[in-house]
Design a protein with these regions (language model features):
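Substrate-binding/active-site clefts of carbohydrate-active enzymes
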Residues: 158, 176-188, 193, 197-378, ...
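Conserved alpha/beta catalytic core and glycan-binding cleft of carbohydrate-active enzymes
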Residues: 164, 344-346, 364-552, 584-629, ...
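Aromatic- and carboxylate-lined catalytic core of secreted/periplasmic carbohydrate-active enzymes
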Residues: 390-391, 397-398, 557-596, 687
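Conserved, mostly hydrophobic/aromatic
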Residues: 87, 196, 221, 231, ...
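Surface-exposed beta-strand/loop patches in extracellular or lumenal glycoproteins
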Residues: 85-88, 95, 99, 620-636
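C-terminal accessory region downstream of the catalytic core in glycan-modifying enzymes
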Residues: 579, 629-664
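C-terminal beta-strand-rich structural cap/linker in extracellular carbohydrate-active enzymes
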Residues: 132-133, 657-693
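The feature marks proteins involved in alpha-glucan
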Residues: 2-71, 79-84, 113-195, 200, ...
Length: 693
């Protein structure tokens, strides 16, 4: 099928893409052809194709006629409610369900039947054949082999505390969760994301729960001003220390945090509080475990995954999906719809998109020219899948949020499908944290150049929205350092009590605030913070593992630090809250252009405006400027935020209660501009508001 698509706007908006027009059009056509095929030549919506989770797995069905009745092992037909279980396993020769209900023994009553030549297997069972809470697996046979497997579509998987083994669990609670808020719509003006991990969301050295997070952490996020949480590690994963990125059961919310109903309540109450909930979804790879995952479900290594060298991810020790298979696309698209519909997630942050886009997974690639995006080394099946996933998400929820974690800079990633892009709403600005780390590590403070900082913060494609951030969970992992730890290091342990700060701590506190303000104030779409980093949470993240004696000491958040009135963490937490409030309280902040007013690299000064807000930064570690003149729109200006305020751990050197008026200059009178004279202390930033006349 060929579909005319003459209006590829991403090419019109970027003349450097013109030489690659044929490739861009081919990729767009591939997605259109896939959509046409999956929707039966546009006879059904894509969301209907993605209903696999309603068909496969374990369900209760209602038989309403003799033809739809249950054929029991005795040959009689039963009516009414009954269990049905289905699995796609084309390579299998026999499948049995084994579990608590049959003593984990293979019996004819629980033997599946192949459905024609589809590769599907099915069994129908009386409603009393199994009950809520019972454990089960599949015994799968194939030519010259056999294995005990967890169903691919299982929606509840638990780990035995004694043996450590995982099994599926019959999940049919008497009290179904009743949603209280079904009409929630995310606030994107702007989108302020709080990246979270349920298990490490508490002070105690253990795994936290959905309920604890809902009761204790959600109120903190509301108070801090964020309007979206990004939940990590929701899909079931065998190894806690993988941070949730080695997924085994894609449809099962991790049971180590609680029940599905408890997760639903968390999301429901977040919505009631005005907080959107997006999921860190992993479709870039899967765990290689055979017993827990999809690796060798029915003896065929290529059932879900690529063949040969492309099967195993060389850096992640995991398996790579074959996005060219219709059944794999069905599985993954159904997974997207499942989380949106069944759990009311508001969207996804797609992990590892770079790994999906390139046959090399982006490893060893430099991405220095446009050739690197269109040289034939891209997985166009993956590009098609990601495009379909975005179309589906926005079809299921028109205001769904989709974010791509992508480091190469692939053009069109966050451009709309109609314009020739892949359809993500946002892409992660992964250059920003790398830049902050680089200058902190490699440049003394007096060498920081505001022009370079400003350029890096605004370095993005003009037609694509981004998520700006100083640091995420990646920068906090063991082996790396958070920004505050790079700035202060071990002095956090000895001089972070208020009144006992040394020069290193004072420097770190000042720069921590300036870095966060500079990053947030230059966003064009969204902003992200990993939980605890807003108040300078100490140390790294290190999940329990053999090398640390399975300790939870560094797999938690010490909220008590920011709650303590005698510690410097309080200053950083209050500053972050007020900074977020300022941006949230500004009408159409992200829709307002960034206008550079002035920079001087020798003086280390930077000033820019967004609407009626003036942002002024003095990165000099030693020089304060009195009566520093900035040519700005004439009028009166009031201080809205000052990193040097005493309440934020600053020195309070300026009187922020003073209204500042511009000085008349005949030379700029026709432009309605005047000179604003300000006192800007060293290593500080101030935000002023131009008042209405």
């Amino acid at each position: 099928m060929t579909v005319p698509n003459s209006n590829i706007k991403i090419i019109e908006r970027d003349e450097w893409l013109k030489p690659y027009e044929n490739t861009i059009r081919r990729r767009h056509d591939n997605a259109i052809r896939s959509l046409y095929s999956l929707t039966l030549k546009n006879q059904i919506p894509l969301s209907d194709f993605a209903n696999g989770y309603k068909y496969y797995g374990l369900h209760i069905e209602q038989a309403e006629s003799e033809d739809a009745g249950l054929n029991t092992s005795s040959g009689h037909t039963a009516f009414g409610r009954h269990w049905v279980f289905r699995e796609w396993a084309p390579n299998a020769t026999a499948i049995y369900l084994v579990g608590d209900f049959n003593g984990w023994q293979e019996t004819e009553q629980f033997r599946l039947t192949r459905i024609g030549n589809t590769g599907d297997w099915e069994i129908r069972m009386p409603i009393d054949a199994m009950s809520h809470g019972q454990h089960y697996k599949m015994n799968v046979y194939w030519r010259n082999g056999q294995g005990e497997r967890i169903p691919a579509w299982a929606n509840r998987v638990v780990q035995d505390e004694d043996t450590g083994l995982f099994s599926a669990q019959v999940w049919n609670p008497t009290d179904k969760y009743v949603w209280k808020n079904s009409s929630f719509h995310p606030n994107r003006s702007p989108l302020l994301i709080y990246e979270c991990h349920i298990g490490m969301g508490q002070d105690a050295e253990r795994v936290g729960t959905y309920n604890e997070f809902r009761e204790n952490v959600l109120p903190r996020i509301v108070a801090a001003g964020y309007n979206c949480i990004q939940l990590m590690a929701i899909q079931e994963h065998p190894y806690y220390g993988s941070f949730g990125y080695h997924v085994s059961s894609f449809f099962a919310p991790s049971s180590r945090f609680g029940t599905p109903e408890e997760l639903k309540r968390l999301i429901d109450e977040a919505h009631t509080m005005g907080i959107a909930v997006i999921m860190d979804i992993v479709h870039s790879h899967a765990v290689k475990n055979e017993n827990e995952g999809l690796a060798l479900l029915a003896g065929d290594e290529s059932q879900y995954f690529c063949q040969g060298e492309r099967r195993r991810h060389p850096a992640w020790d995991s398996l790579c999906f074959d996005y060219g298979k219709k059944e794999v696309v069905h599985f993954l698209l159904s997974n997207c719809k499942y989380w949106l519909e069944e759990f009311h997630f508001d969207g996804f942050r797609f992990d590892g998109v770079t790994s999906m886009l390139y046959y090399s997974h982006g490893l060893g690639e430099s991405f220095v020219s446009y050739d690197d995006y269109f040289n034939g080394r891209q997985d166009e099946d993956a590009i098609s899948y990601l495009t379909l996933a975005n179309l589906l998400a926005h079809q299921v929820k028109s205001d769904a949020i989709t974010i791509a974690e992508e480091v190469s800079g692939m053009p069109g990633l966050a451009a709309s499908f109609e314009d020739g892009g892949m359809g993500f709403d946002y892409r992660m600005s992964m250059n920003i944290p790398d830049y902050w780390i680089k200058i902190i590590k490699e440049q003394p403070d007096e060498k920081w150049k505001p022009s370079s900082i400003f350029w890096e913060l605004c370095n993005r494609r003009k037609d694509e929205l981004t998520v700006s951030y100083c640091e995420s969970h990646d920068q906090a992992l063991v082996g790396d350092k958070t920004i505050i730890f790079r700035l202060v290091d071990s002095d956090m342990y000895w001089h972070f009590r208020i009144g006992d700060q040394n020069d290193t701590v004072n420097r770190g506190i000042a720069l921590h605030k300036m870095i966060r303000l500079a990053t947030l104030s230059t966003i064009n779409g969204a902003y992200l913070n990993f939980m605890g980093n807003e108040f300078g949470h100490p140390e790294w993240i290190d999940f329990p593992r053999e090398n640390n004696n399975w300790s939870y000491k560094y797999a938690r958040r010490q909220w008590s630090l920011v709650d303590a009135d005698d510690l410097c963490y309080k200053w950083l937490g209050v500053f972050d809250r007020d900074m977020i409030r300022l941006v949230k309280g500004t009408n159409d902040f992200v829709g307002t252009a960034i206008l550079e007013i002035w920079h001087d690299d020798n003086q280390q000064m930077l000033a820019f405006m967004r609407g009626n807000l003036l942002f002024v930064f003095n990165f000099s570690p030693t020089v304060s400027y009195a009566d520093y003149g900035l040519l700005v729109p004439e009028g009166s200006y009031n201080v809205m935020l000052n990193t040097d305020s005493i309440e934020y751990g600053g020195n309070g050197l300026a009187d922020d209660s003073v209204t500042h008026f511009t000085n008349f200059d005949q030379l700029y009178a026709k432009q309605h501009k005047g000179w604003l004279k300000l006192y800007i202390p060293a290593r500080s930033a101030v935000v002023l508001k131009l008042e209405d006349k």
